[in-house]
Amino acid sequence: QRQMCIRDRVKDRLILIPRIYTNKPRTTGDGYKGMLHQPDPNSSPDMLRGLIAIRKMHMKVIAETGFSCADEMLYPENHHYLSDMLSYVAVGARSVENQLHRLTASGLDLPVGMKNPTSGDLSVMMNSITAAQHPHTFVYSNWEVQSKGNPLAHAILRGSSNKYGRTIPNYHYEDIKILCELYAKSGLKNPAVVIDTNHSNSGKQWDEQPRIAKEILHSTRHSDDILHLVKGLMIESYIEDGNQKPDGGVYGKSITDACIGWDKTERLIYELADLR
């Protein structure tokens, strides 16, 4: 609803797509896994109630704001519960090498962003995009299906971690130029990248996101190739700054990844619009 209030003010320069993630991949498998698993984060998992809850939430957003949202395809077999309501899908860093994620992405009729893996190997991401852009025959939900290929499959840069667990960003000018070169050699359709300003790109320093976002737009001013390749930014934002445990009790504060709050988000949206 807050984004809706400023959408019309920036619509000639920016397209806003709310990022509503209903599943949460966990590095160790421990912790809150999102509304799909636990519609009530303080109760036991209930995936039937979770499926109903995530669909109702996306429907409510459309009904009250007109926004169709982005979600992560953590479980390919569950995508059809939301396929009629989403405008964007992301395949995460831990899923991007998975065959079923790639093949399912090839059958979707909306943009699908493929993140670079946590290792940072861009060839893995590019191979995933290639697979998603080609037609396939495969088994999905116990049916043999055929896909036509998804020409809107594209890259998401989210940073990586080295063998010592240190984060390595890949949002800088030089990183995007390398991706431009990979795309030029690939022959892929509709070259595009969305850049994640959090995760390993921020070193999980959530409050660095505004600076990172503005640096990316600065890079687009110094290279036509980058200007044409960068289609968007993925920003983790909510109502309050930071995050809390599921039983923290602060309304509007994330119970998963730390986010920038609404005041910073609103300011950043206007600043990005002015830079366009």
Each language-model region and where it sits:
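Mid-to-C-terminal alpha-helical segments outside catalytic/metal-binding sites
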Residues: 262-267, 276
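Conserved, mostly hydrophobic/aromatic
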Residues: 195, 261
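Redox- and metal-dependent alpha/beta enzyme cores, enriched for Fe-S-associated oxidoreductases
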Residues: 179-184
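Short helix/strand-capping connector loops at secondary-structure junctions
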Residues: 244-256
